[in-house]
């Protein structure tokens, strides 16, 4: 079963979690080099990238899992791909999918700047159309894309995720709205309902062991069992 604090489960205000994340950010080691540059660019240009505490979690997961091949759904400007590339063992590869042309251009530029063009393969296109065409097996899959499409991504991700692999999903608490009781703003209802559906699918899938962490905007970590 996923881990959720009692406060979150009851729909209490997320203020305590926000304060915790602020504290965590204050003590984390600051990024350097290209990652620091991209953080500043994202902040100045309002580009969404993973939160600092989520970035640290991804780094730890990558170091522990030692994935030979990673699939990322949602490249944006390439920040997470560059971050995860630093955790790969020798010979490791990353495939990353992005549909936005401006993001694709910036991602290619940043991947070149990071000197990892031979490691990171950027695939242009909508993930819903690209995923069924992929025939590789992955040790780790990271989803950070259109939140309302997570349920559609899941079957294809499970098809390609190796036994013993990790499926990491970002923004699964979506600004605290997923765990909040009461009415949801009309323009957010679809995303909230689809994300709740996605979490139910993760937590009730017999092939997965899933934990939901209140880190950043919420991260679900699902381990693909070696036997079911």
Predicted segments, located by residue:
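A short alpha-helical cap/connector motif
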Residues: 3-140, 147-168, 172-228
């Amino acid at each position: 079963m996923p881990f959720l604090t009692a406060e979150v489960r009851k729909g209490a205000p997320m203020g305590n979690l926000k304060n915790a994340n602020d504290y965590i950010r204050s003590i984390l080691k600051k990024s350097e080099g290209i990652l620091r540059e991209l953080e500043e660019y994202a902040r100045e240009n309002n580009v969404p990238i993973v939160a600092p505490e989520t970035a640290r979690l991804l780094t730890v997961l990558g170091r522990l899992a030692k994935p030979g091949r990673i699939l990322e759904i949602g490249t944006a400007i390439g920040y997470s791909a560059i971050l995860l590339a630093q955790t790969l063992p020798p010979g490791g590869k990353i495939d990353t999918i992005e549909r936005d042309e401006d993001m694709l251009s910036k991602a290619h530029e940043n991947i070149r700047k990071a000197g990892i063009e031979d490691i990171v393969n950027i695939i242009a296109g909508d993930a819903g159309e690209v995923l069924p065409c992929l025939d590789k097996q992955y040790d780790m899959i990271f989803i950070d894309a259109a939140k309302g499409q997570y349920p559609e991504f899941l079957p294809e991700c499970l098809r390609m995720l190796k036994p013993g692999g990790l499926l990491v999903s970002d923004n699964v608490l979506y600004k605290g709205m997923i765990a909040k009781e009461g009415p949801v703003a009309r323009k957010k209802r679809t995303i909230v309902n689809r994300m709740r559906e996605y979490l139910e699918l993760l937590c009730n899938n017999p092939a997965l062991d899933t934990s939901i962490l209140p880190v950043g905007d919420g991260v679900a970590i699902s381990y693909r069992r070696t036997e079911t």
